[in-house]
Design a protein with these regions (language model features):
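Glycine-rich phosphate-binding loop of ATP-dependent small-molecule kinases
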Residues: 1-182
Length: 182
């Protein structure tokens, strides 16, 4: 599940996991969980998250590769917010190929104006540190500079499923389900 900040990755990922009866792995949630810990690494992670930045390629890749390696051959999982950089997308694809695991990358597409509106709305509800207005601008830049390349990689591999995220939560979910032929 990929998309701009506020595109609904978490919400749609949870709904898809429920429909499939499987687990969901959220890169953002995992990193926020790690940032709540104690010690040097937790502080470094917290600093990056609070600034709206991305952790190093190797770090993010290590986390989702570890999850992939722990799955049984018939297990299904939804990854939400993974592969935010080209190197991560390539590592995911290489790992999935080695494990003989087919996959689809779902891209929830929304424009930048909608990102700002949704995050402003979410900020009052969830209170995430990475939803501060200056941080949102940086997250949009990070998306444009990095995540867009990962999405293009998946498009060229023929595994990208693009869905408009501009509708009600239920209608977007229905589009995701239809796009995946579920």
């Amino acid at each position: 599940m990929m998309g701009r900040p506020g595109s609904g990755k978490g919400t749609q990922g949870k709904m898809l996991a429920k429909k499939l009866g499987c687990e969901i792995y959220s890169s953002g949630n995992r990193m926020r969980e790690m940032a709540r810990g104690h010690g040097f690494v937790a502080e470094k992670i917290k600093k990056v998250i609070d600034s709206g930045g991305l952790l190093p390629n190797w770090f993010s890749s290590h986390l989702f590769v570890e999850v992939l390696l722990g799955l049984a051959p018939d297990d299904t999982i939804v990854f939400e917010g993974a592969c935010r950089r080209l190197h991560e997308a390539q590592a995911f694809d290489e790992t999935a190929a080695w494990l003989e695991r087919p996959y689809k990358a779902i891209f929830l597409n929304i424009p930048d104006e909608e990102v700002e509106r949704r995050i402003a709305e979410r900020k009052g509800v969830e209170g995430r540190a990475d939803d501060a207005s200056d941080t949102v601008e940086r997250r949009i830049r990070e998306y444009d500079e990095h995540t867009a390349h990962a999405i293009e990689f998946f498009r060229q591999k023929g595994v990208l499923v693009e869905v408009s995220g501009l509708d009600t939560i239920e209608n977007v979910h229905q589009r995701v389900v239809e796009a995946l032929s579920l």
